[in-house]
Amino acid sequence: MSPDSRDPEAQRDVGLTKNTSSVNIPLESVKTDKTSNASPIMGPGEGPKIDDTLVSWSGPDDSQNPQNMPQWKKWVITWLLSFLNVWVTFSSTIFASAVRTTSLEYGVSRVVMTLGVSLTVLGFAVGPLIWGPMSEVIGRLTPFYFGYAVFCIFQIPVGVAQNVYTILICRFFIGFFGTSAMAVTPGVLADIFSPKDRGVAVSVYAAAAFIGPIFGPIVGGFVVDSSLGWRWTAWITLILASAFGLAALVFVPETYGPIILQRRAARLRQETRNFAYHSALDENPPTLNDIIFKYFLRPFQMLIKEPILLLVTLYISLVYGVLYLFFVAYPIEFLEVRRWTHAGVAALPLLAVMLGTLAGCLTILFVTGHTYPRKMAKMGRVPPEERLKLMMVGSVSLPIGLFWFGWTSSRSVHWFAQTAAGFPIGIGLALIWVQGLSFLIDVYLMFANSALAGNTLIRSAVGAAFPLFGAPMYHKLGVNWASSLLGFLSVAMIPIPVAFYYYGPKIRAMSKFSPKL
């Protein structure tokens, strides 16, 4: 048996498509097909035995199939989970506004206190390696609610911390446990939406990934400079995250098909005393070796052997690093260079970046909604390279914004001229990020979880590192040349989507991980 033949994705496909048994039938008609596991040697004219005890969906309209949820409920779930992800990413950057204050309070350098941001992002790198596998073994809800609850709890020691070590250690665990929501949400969206309808939901989720970290320093700046003080950056996060977490506890059910069918089979065994009832997941439960290979070994194997995954991951990692570095760069520009006096006001220019990311996500929705149905009707499928058109647009928009931001850094230049540079930066971030990840999913399909696990690990490590060297770089080079350096790096990445747009099909044809469709 190949290592991939027992993947949870494969089990899910089996569980969602096989319809060999209906559970909505009179109990007296339930029977155990004791011949279903007979010898595979069959006589002439014989076909395979049907296993009447294999529990699957009762039909395409099975009410317990998450794909058949009412549309309103699907969107309640989508918006709730997106808001939970907003507060997780919000928590990663709200502390950035407290770096200056806490460094003075505890008598350490700002670089040390910047670890409060970097360690949270580092937790984002490690967490999915745990929460991803758990969500496919025991279902979506258990790891999600457990991780999110602990994420909320770890806000408390930060709020009452009496030393730097408590803050830094707890900030790491805030990222580690908070990423349970980030790791589980894409799976939930895949569970409840068909591929045709999933694009809008994924764009909403992707927008949350940008709104949270941008919103964090703005709120944090006003909180830190108010009578509340920096400790309320933790209390506000706790209040907001807990409120939405309780709402999710009420409205978000289990959505992982194989787990739902496994529980249905267990209920039938108890009600009928027929212990032959089982689900596809009972037949092929994921083993420890499967999980280790899929989430720990295969991602690195793919990063080494797959040029598409490696180069797109490097590009997305740069984008992620730039996003988190800006939470250091903006205070330097507006508090130190322009000599604004209020941290919250100095963070308001980040709203231009947020508006740009929203514009980028809306562009993706508009283009996808208009071009994909036509191509699907004409070709029967849409090649993954179609995603790269907007990614190429973003690859031009990002460096334009970075150079614009850098060379309008002067007190003699009106602040609005520099603030406006955030809009093309935001568009570039969104188009590269969302379309890059969508491209990887389309390329690797059933191996997408492994591909995204490797991508998440690398990009989060880069995102954790950038704020640490960002402040020294901006102080030494100045805002002009530090931003230009990022702009030159972005220009160097432009050939990646261009090359894969033209040569992607040939490269995919040589890949052992990209299905030949």
UniProtKB/Swiss-Prot annotation:
InterPro entries linked: MFS, MFS_dom, MFS_trans_sf
Which Gene3D superfamilies has this protein been placed in?
MFS general substrate transporter like domains
Keyword terms: Glycoprotein, Membrane, Transmembrane, Transmembrane helix, Transport, Virulence
Q: How does it sit in the membrane?
A: Multi-pass membrane protein
Q: Where is this region: Disordered?
A: 1-45
The annotated regions of Basic and acidic residues compositional bias extend over 1-12
Main subcellular location = membrane
The role this protein plays is: MFS transporter; part of the gene cluster that mediates the biosynthesis the mycotoxin ascochitine, an o-quinone methide that plays a possible protective role against other microbial competitors in nature and is considered to be important for pathogenicity of legume-associated Didymella species.
- The protein in question is named Ascochitine biosynthesis cluster MFS transporter
At the highest ranks, the source species' classification is:
Eukaryota, Fungi, Dikarya, Ascomycota, Pezizomycotina
